[in-house]
């Protein structure tokens, strides 16, 4: 797909509003904070999260689509798994530049309950806060992008070619592809996400300092299991998100840009 269609598809997804409660519960669990069932609390920071998901997904689709075009260089063939994954990793890393500050706003709103404007003012009072947690975000997004942009198409194609009777079309193969992509994206990236979330929830640096200091603190408090706090909520959200976005990529993409799927 070309650059512009990829950007358009990146903006068109409804999953952030549907899955915000999963995101809230995951963030609170990672920081060892109580979970509220009040929808007004669960949806704190949803505006920043919507912008985050829209902009990051747009960047990932656009950069990933352009890189795949460059790799193919006009050839009519499928990308290899390595080529798919390399494109996803690069696209995800770039998207972290936008995603990290926006997630910081969301997490601070969830922790403090301030308005959007007050939260931005609180963060920018110390400019060093703006990119707090970027390393964790960049690594997580790099691997996550592989999980939803790179792995599902390869898995779907492999299942349909290897087991054509069981998986005769994309619709049948999509569910196992989403489960595998979500599993890869969740458990491989979750330790980085936990470190990032703890750092962004503590901009005052009372408990968590740098990336390495935060990782050491989590390990000393809870051993390796501390890095997987909130993983159940995240995996549930990711499987739903991968399914929605893989479906959207195919159905909406084909409707808007049929020539790209010829």
Language model regions located:
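Flexible extramembrane linkers and terminal tails adjacent to transmembrane helices
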Residues: 1-11, 25-40, 61-139, 144-225, ...
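Alpha-helical transmembrane segments of multi-pass membrane proteins
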Residues: 15-26
